[in-house]
Each structure stands twice: as structure tokens, then as C-alpha cells.
Amino acid sequence: MRWLPGLLLIASIGFHQSLADRVLVLGETAAVKDTHSVFLNSVKERGHELTVRAADDSQLALFKHGQLIFDHLFILAPGVQVFGGSLSPSEISKFVDAGGNVLVAAGSNIGDALREIAAEHGFEFEEAGTSVIDHHNYDQTLDSGDHTTLVVGKDQLISAELIVGNSAKLHPVLFKGIGLVAGKTNNLALSIVRASGTAYSYDPKAVRATNPSIAGSRTLLVGGLQSRNNARIVFTGSSELFSNTFFSAKTNSVNPSVQGAQSGNADFATAITRWVMKESGVLRVKTVNHHKKGETVPPVEGYFITEDVVYTIEIEELKNGKWVPFQGKDVQLEFVRIDPFVRATLKNSNGRLSVAFKLPDVLGVFKFLVDYRRVGYTHLYDVQQVSVRPLWHTQYERFIRSAYPYYASSFSMMAGLVLFSIVYLYHKDTPVKGAKVLDSEKKKN
């Protein structure tokens, strides 16, 4: 039996590894392990299994026998033109449709492959060779003179702590690369980091002067989206944003208010990857219950109109690898047939949200519907279908107070009919004496 503890240890290790998320990291060369080692190690330290490959590796694949081989895909290969193996932009779209999450980091030397991936998801990178330039917010130490190494302030970040972390404490972020724009019809697009109002996209090596294609805050430095199946994708125009150089650098902006501060690239990269890998902003429904007021279980025969009901739902949020009660106070319940007949905000008591209300005086098939959509969170959707019936004849009130005048008129009519009948049937007329004398005289004649 000496082998039993060892066997249990091996089994526990295998079980732990099976729970770890599998990440495929693609670089232009194997050098990405060195140039981005701090970033990759930070992801590995959070319990993920990383597989680093060249983007043109002939053995690349995301599916095997119809199943996902990896849970997440990081592309740190800006200049890739064609992926190796079975990998392609359409294959990556299938990966997202299957629930996989993607991080794409481009650069000024962007290739066609990354441009196609962005187009598949409602974004468009600028032309190859262009860079985002800002003459008022660049780093004086790292910049080569083109003013393309930008210092990004906290006011340029999206107001979503789940995605970018605590922006109030975040140091300026260094960015060098290409800009992108979100499609006008892309309703799912998130403008995670915008360029400043003085920035523009241009080719710094262009000999002939032309107007910038995009400028100002319309230029995105980092964009993303959460698809309808809750898969997450992040696009950035700077692979250097995740590099060791930018992680360890101190900002030396032309703006004196942000000089000398340690760059916030490491904290920003941690926050953005935690979000895209669904380590944060994930909700789930634990339990749902609805019943008549004063009872504890749903009625077998369904509900009846105008009954008082209580609806309760328990929601949990994933934080630091553990499911904890969700503390949101803006979750709403709708009681829907075709349109909502009732809409009420649920009261949160440490993750247990509830509301009591009266059913409408309308019969039919209804749904208890919770449809919670907030930036940074996964889409929470729960439906409980119930029937609402009319009252049985024995359930109606014997006398309705509002009908008392009609009751009174009915009873008064019946009483009047009885009195009239008595008078008519039992009243006898008294004969007139004069009439009898006249009758006797007529007989004599």
C-alpha cells in the first residue's frame, strides 16, 4: 500500500491541471518568450498553462475531433501574413463561436492575418506603416523622435474597473503602435482605451504630406467586445504594450505632471487579461425560486390572477477564483407575456435578490425574466415560465362591495313586486250605495 499516497498525489496533480485554462501564445519568432517573459510569467503564475508557438508553425490547431484544444488564444505576432497549420481568421472566428477568448496585439508592421481577424469582429486597423502620433503626450526617453511612444492617462480609459482595473490608482500606460476604429454597426464594441484629442494616425516616414485618416478620441488604442455567447476578444495596436521594456520603464512624458512615475503597463496588462480570460466579470445563477406569498414552493396548478407572489434569485460572481455573492443593486425582474406587465428592481441581501408583487389581472403564459447586461460582466439571462389562470367560480367573492347599489336596486324591485302583488290580489273594492238604488229602479221599470 506504499504506492497509494503517490498514486493519489499524481491523481490530484492531474485533476488540478485539467482545471487549468489552456492558453496558446503565438509570436512571430521564439524570441517572444524573452521579450515578453514578464507578461507571460504573470499569466502562468495565475494558474494557466501556456503553450508558446511561432505563428507560422505547421502544427497549429485550435480544434481536435471537434473539441477545443485551448481555452484562450494570445496573438503577439503583429506582422504575420498567414498562419501555419489549420489556423486562419475564419478558424479563429469558429474558436470564438465555441466560447474561446482571444487577445490580439498588433503593431505598425501589421500583416493581413490580424487585419482580417479584426474585420471579422467589427474593428478595422489602420494602414500598415502608420502609427498613432501625439505631440503633446509622448515619452521623451523611449521615443525615437517621431512622437509615437505615447503616455496614456487614466482619463483615456473606459470607466469599467472590471476591464482596466482601478484606474484611479493606475499609473500612466505606455503605448507604441497602430490605431484602430470600431465599425459604426458594431453594437458590441467596447472602446477600452482611446487616444487623446491631440493624437492622430499617420505614417511618420511618409515623404508626401497627406491628411490623417483618423484623429482625436475616435482613434482606439485598445478595443474589445464580448460576443453574445460571452466569449471575449481584445484588440490592441501595440504588442510592445506587453513587452518587458514597457513593463519596467518609468514614464518621462513631455507633460511634466506625469514624469518619473513607474509605467502602469504591468497592472493594465494584468487587468485586461484577467477580463479577457474570464477571471473577472463572470456571473452565474445559483438558485431561482418563486412562490405565492406565505408559501415556499411554486404552485403545481400555476398561479391565479391578482395573487401576491415572491420571486427570489441567488447570483454569484467569480472573484479571485472563488464564487462569492454578487453585490449588484441594479438587477431588475420583468414579468412578461409579450410585453412586460411588471418591472421591478430586486432588493439585494448578500447575493440573494428578491421582490414581492401582485400578478396582473390578465391570464396567459408568463415568464419571470432576468436579463442583466452591464459593461464588463457576462450576460446573465434566466427565464422561468409559469401560467396565470382565471379564478375558479368558488374563488370569487360572494358579494362585491362596489356592486352594493345594484344589489339594493334588485332587492328593492323584488320587494316592490311582492307588495304590488299583495295589494293587487287581496284588495277588495267597496260597492257604492247609489249604484244599487239605480239598479232596483231599472228593474221596476
Curated annotation (Swiss-Prot):
GO cellular component: oligosaccharyltransferase complex
Any single GO BP term: protein N-linked glycosylation via asparagine
Subcellular location: Endoplasmic reticulum membrane
Disruption phenotype: RNAi-mediated knock-down is mostly embryonic lethal. Embryogenesis proceeds more slowly and embryos are osmo-sensitive. RNAi-mediated knockdown reduces lifespan.
Residues exposed to the Cytoplasmic side: 427-445
Lumenal topological domain: 21-405
Primary location: endoplasmic reticulum
Pfam family, one: OST48_N
Transmembrane segments: 406-426
Membrane topology (UniProt): Single-pass type I membrane protein
Superkingdom of the organism of origin: Eukaryota
Keywords assigned: Endoplasmic reticulum, Membrane, Signal, Transmembrane, Transmembrane helix
The keyword Endoplasmic reticulum appears for this protein: yes
Signal peptide stretch: 1-20
Pathways involved: Protein modification; protein glycosylation
PANTHER family: DOLICHYL-DIPHOSPHOOLIGOSACCHARIDE--PROTEIN GLYCOSYLTRANSFERASE 48 KDA SUBUNIT (PTHR10830:SF0)
Biological role: Subunit of the oligosaccharyl transferase (OST) complex that catalyzes the initial transfer of a defined glycan (Glc(3)Man(9)GlcNAc(2) in eukaryotes) from the lipid carrier dolichol-pyrophosphate to an asparagine residue within an Asn-X-Ser/Thr consensus motif in nascent polypeptide chains, the first step in protein N-glycosylation. N-glycosylation occurs cotranslationally and the complex associates with the Sec61 complex at the channel-forming translocon complex that mediates protein translocation across the endoplasmic reticulum (ER). All subunits are required for a maximal enzyme activity.
Protein family (similarity comment): Belongs to the DDOST 48 kDa subunit family.
Quaternary structure and interacting proteins, as annotated: Component of the oligosaccharyltransferase (OST) complex.
Name listed for the protein in its UniProt record: Dolichyl-diphosphooligosaccharide--protein glycosyltransferase 48 kDa subunit
Gene name of this polypeptide: ostb-1
